Structure formats: C-alpha cells, structure tokens
C-alpha cells in the first residue's frame, strides 16, 4: 500500500518499504514512519559561533546534535556525508529525555542549550 509523506515540500509518494528523498522517512505498513527519531549520528559541544547566529551569547558553548537525512541537496553542504546518509549510517540511540539530561549536565562546562544541526532538523520530527 502506498503512502504520501506530508512533512516537507517534496511530498514523496512511497511504495511499501520505500524510503523518501530525505532518507529519514519510510513507508512501513502503509504508514510514514521516521527512521532517525531518537538516533544520533553526531554529538559535540561547540562554540556558539559555529552556528549561523550573529552576536548571540558570544563565547558560550552549545550542545550540537544531529541525525541522518535531509530533504535538501545543497552543493556546498559541509555535512553531506551525514545529511545524505540513511538508516544504515552508524548512529546511537538517544531518547529525547537522555539528550536533555546530557545538555543540562554540560551546563557546568558552559553549555547554554541544545542545537539540532548537521542535517535538516525537520526530517527527524
């Protein structure tokens, strides 16, 4: 049974077992399911200046987290290996509650929050 994904502008129509253009959603039993939910491919404590923000809390750190999959194909993407990967890419399970606790635990090292990055964050919704 085919199903249509409505998460992004591509609106992929997927046959049973097929994965969408983003490689982060698939048709399983006629339902669109997220493949990367609560799975991390990358995790790092980064300077806030690495984010595309200007003059936001300069000198602070932020926990950067990301998974696989992206609905874009930017020719300049510095994370293409991660963002265009699929569910076979090495990832670790990390439920949202665990990620929040990790971010909170890093406050003593100057962490100010959590940034979803490395891939297009919407596809993991």
Residue ranges of model-derived segments:
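Conserved Radical SAM active-site core
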Residues: 27-125
